[in-house]
C-alpha cells in the first residue's frame, strides 16, 4: 500500500493482469477512499487489446499517455466509431457504452482511465485471463 493516500504510484498497488496487459488502480474506494470515481494506469502490450465491453452504469474517461492505438466507442445508435489515438488524446465513453482498445504500435500503450461511479472495473476480476500482480514497491 502507498505511504500516503494522496500520492500513489502504480508500482505500489496490486494490479489486475490480463493476456493483453494490466490495470493498476491508483485511486478508488479500496486504495484511498475516493467515493465518486476510481481510476488508474492501463498498460496495453503491442498487438494487444481488450475485447468489446461496457461498464454498466458508469462513464469512463481514457487519456492516452504514450503509444498509439485504435479506440472504438459505439454511438447512440450502437454503431461502432473508431479512431486512431495517440499521446494526449482524451476519449469519452458515455454511460454503459460498448468500447474497445487495440495497441497498434510497436511499444506498450499507456492510458490513464477514470470510471464514474467507482466499482464497475471490479467486474474485470471475472474475466478468464484475470490474475493479480503484486505491488513492486
Model-identified regions with their sequence ranges:
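A short hydrophobic beta-strand segment most commonly corresponding to one strand
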Residues: 41-42, 61, 92, 107-122
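Conserved metal-binding segment of the jelly-roll/cupin
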Residues: 85-104, 116
